[in-house]
């Protein structure tokens, strides 16, 4: 008996699914856009006209008004409110009393020079002070620059020399013992290099803010003279007495 050749664990069987090695094209791997319908239509083909369907429209006989929800005044028309004339009663307006001049503020006897022709008259007054003061500068108001010395203006100055005393620094009379003493140096405060002690300031007493104006007292008011809420008592005014010997000025004469 010849020995059987070992063929391994694989045995011929029916495949459970498609084997991609058996296909030369990708096959159903790619989804081609459809040529029917409207959604996802292929862009390489013309698309046929499509129609949309919807429900039946609403009935026209249906009432779309809010109904008796709003209470409309029956007196309101398209031209406005239909009412009769109405009047309102208010208080009398308070008219401001103007301070007009009275008869005593006029002097008609002084108006003759404005109404009738008068002779020319001249007025004599004191001499004005503006002509006495001469506003032009005098000879003493000018200060001419000097023409001598090194500080000449507009001129060429000659060389000048200054003479001063001889310095004792480095000379035979220089006193070498004059060195600065302890009092020649300024003493530095201790608080600059050491801890500074606490300091307190004493100020004046602070008064609280208040109103210090003068207020009227009880004697400054006169309630008996107030007639805002009560009728005013009758008052009589007196005028001036006109003279019987002076003819009044009559302007409007026709």
Swiss-Prot record:
InterPro entries linked to this entry: CIMAP, SHIPPO-rpt
Tissue expression notes: Testis-specific (at protein level). Expression restricted to the germ cell fraction, absent in somatic cell fractions such as Sertoli and Leydig cells. Expression detected in the third week postpartum (23 days) after haploid germ cells developed, expression increased with age. Expressed in the tails of elongated spermatids sticking out toward the tubular lumen, and in cytoplasmic droplets still attached to the spermatid tail membrane. Expressed in the tails of mature sperm, from the connecting piece proximal to the head, along the middle and principal pieces, down to the distal end piece.
Positions of the UniProt region annotated as Disordered: 207-228
Q: Which residues form the signal peptide?
A: none
Keyword annotations for this protein, in alphabetical order, are: Cell projection, Cilium, Cytoplasm, Cytoskeleton, Developmental protein, Differentiation, Flagellum, Repeat, Spermatogenesis
Look up the record and report any one GO term of the cellular component aspect: cytoplasm
The cellular location(s) given in this protein's UniProt record come to: Cytoplasm; Cytoplasm, Cytoskeleton, Flagellum axoneme
Return any one Pfam family short name.
SHIPPO-rpt
Pinpoint the residue ranges of every STPGR repeat in the record: 180-205, 216-241
GO terms in the biological process aspect are: cell differentiation; flagellated sperm motility; spermatogenesis
Entry keyword annotation includes Transferase: no
What top-level branch of life does the organism fall under? Eukaryota
Q: What else is known?
A: 'Shippo' is a Japanese word for tail.
Q: How does it assemble?
A: Microtubule inner protein component of sperm flagellar doublet microtubules.
What is the protein name stated in its UniProt record? Ciliary microtubule associated protein 1A
Q: Which organism is it from?
A: Mus musculus (Mouse)
Whichever gene encodes this chain, its name is: Cimap1a
């Amino acid at each position: 008996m010849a020995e059987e050749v070992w063929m391994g664990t694989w045995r011929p069987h029916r495949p459970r699914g498609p084997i991609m090695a058996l296909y030369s094209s990708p096959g159903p791997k790619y989804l081609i856009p459809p040529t029917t319908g409207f959604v996802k239509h292929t862009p390489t083909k013309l698309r046929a006209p499509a129609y949309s369907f919807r429900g039946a429209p609403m009935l026209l006989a249906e009432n779309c008004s809010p109904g008796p929800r709003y209470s409309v005044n029956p007196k309101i028309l398209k031209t406005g409110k239909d009412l009769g004339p109405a009047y309102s009663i208010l208080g009398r307006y308070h008219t401001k009393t103007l301070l007009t001049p009275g008869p005593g503020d006029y002097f008609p006897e002084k108006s003759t020079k404005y109404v009738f022709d008068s002779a020319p008259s001249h007025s004599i007054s004191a001499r004005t002070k503006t002509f006495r003061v001469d506003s032009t500068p005098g000879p003493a108001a000018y200060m001419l620059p000097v023409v001598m010395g090194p500080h000449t203006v507009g001129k060429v100055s000659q060389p000048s020399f200054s003479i001063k005393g001889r310095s004792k620094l480095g000379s035979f009379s220089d006193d070498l013992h004059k060195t600065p003493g302890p009092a020649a140096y300024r003493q530095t405060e201790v608080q600059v290099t050491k801890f500074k002690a606490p300091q307190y300031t004493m100020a004046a007493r602070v008064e609280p803010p208040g109103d210090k104006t003068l207020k009227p007292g009880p004697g400054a008011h006169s309630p008996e003279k107030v007639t805002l809420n009560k009728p005013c008592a009758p008052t009589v005014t007196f005028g001036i007495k006109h003279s019987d010997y002076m003819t009044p000025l009559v302007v409007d004469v026709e």
